[in-house]
Curated annotation (Swiss-Prot):
Protein's UniProt keywords contain Phosphoprotein: yes
Annotated region described as Disordered, given as residue ranges: 238-286, 345-379
GO biological process per UniProt: cellular response to histamine; chemical synaptic transmission; G protein-coupled receptor signaling pathway; G protein-coupled receptor signaling pathway, coupled to cyclic nucleotide second messenger; positive regulation of vasoconstriction; regulation of vascular permeability
Transmembrane annotation, as ranges: 30-50, 65-89, 98-123, 145-164, 189-211, 417-440, 447-469
Molecular function, one GO term: neurotransmitter receptor activity
Binding site for histamine: D107, T112, N198, Y431
Organism, as annotated: Pongo pygmaeus
Record field: compositional bias (Polar residues): 353-369
Major localisation: membrane
Name of protein: Histamine H1 receptor
Subcellular location: Cell membrane
Recorded topology in the membrane: Multi-pass membrane protein
CC per GO annotation: dendrite; plasma membrane; synapse
Amino acid sequence: MSLPNSSCLLEDKMCEGNKTTMASPQLMPLVVVLSTISLVTVGLNLLVLYAVRSERKLHTVGNLYIVSLSVADLIVGAVVMPMNILYLLMSKWSLGRPLCLFWLSMDYVASTASIFSVFILCIDRYRSVQQPLRYLKYRTKTRASATILGAWFLSFLWVIPILGWNHFRQQISVRREDKCETDFYDVTWFKVMTAIINFYLPTLLMLWFYAKIYKAVQKHCQHRELINGSLPSFSEIKLRPENPKGDAKKPGKESPWEVLKRKPKDAGGGSVLKSPSQTPKEMKSPVVFSQEDDGEVDKLHCFPLDIVQMQTVAEGSSRDYVAINQSHGQLKTDEQGLNTHGASEISEDQMLGDSQSFSRTDSDTTTETAPGKGKLRSGSNTGLDYIKFTWKRLRSHSRQYVSGLHMNRERKAAKQLGFIMAAFILCWIPYFIFFMVIAFCKNCCNEHLHMFTIWLGYINSTLNPLIYPLCNENFKKTFKRILHIRS
């Protein structure tokens, strides 16, 4: 594939009959515009790289692909564009063959690396959406870095034909000293083959991947709506027995990810908390909460799930018990009762791991409660069934909640990928269509149109860093902070 370079603009064989000579004064406005584009491209991509380096929130696996794309775009803006402008001004190449080969190599390598970076970014988003939980274990910075290095290695393979084409051919190509062009500029089969491998095939695969991503996200959203419509929402779940007395919902209920807490009441008929003789650190048996006629948990505090384990529930005396085991964590008391040890927010990874630890203890426990109030007994079928039901529901909703968080993030990432792909295709496809036409019809080249398609492809490197803050709130905030822009 002849990735964008301006050699065709001056190649008599490729553009013969349509070539026009432009005077330098006429070129100056165009040179100013193109130079501005080059400077903006360099500045924006440097801003992206600095933002990722300086902001910890941007240190993610997915942004490694963005860094790769930004490096490729930076090379286009800092090396390829300026030398193209210089070649356009001179109307002939007078900088020598070594510098010509360097420019051609940077042009082909950077443009291919940009295409491949978008491609592997698309694959990453596809696997994140299609296999979220499985791919999370596989999706590491080491593997992502290896994939990126592989993409750049394939891109650098362009150096072989650029520098050594004549070494692989018996016939030596005629080289024009005042032109900067590859030795295979007139080899149709090679250019068509590489165009298919480097652009058309990756583009078709990316469109297929993105269609799958779109369908998966859409299907997940429909599934979530169906679940939310048929089951109580995650925030509405309460640990309570299914009896008529406990059906009335109390105002001000808090999140289900909070551990049970009841204040003792002076008057009868209220709930009673049996205070253990040991401190929470010293407790070896579960802390048991008793509850009277209302049959409903008063308050839940945010605990990591691995310290919460459901025990058997006593039957009789209109009480229901929920036990909290401390085998995996320490509880901290305050004047109001039990509180958390500072876990107000549960991360996605914690929930994935903790949901496995949220389970019923293996052994039955018998514990005395307040005098005259009843006893916690093993073998309570009704209570045990309720505990099992509650555990299954909490586990199911925790997984749905984690899956929802992950899919929410991936939906935003898919949106970002959609904009990147749209810009990529719109900017590059005119050049490659025109390129295929020229490959089969050497007299069909129009100098001005071909130059326009080349620079349209280059402008893709300018647009990419503008897309990131539009689709990513962290990029937007970081850009504003770096540029000292107030919201």
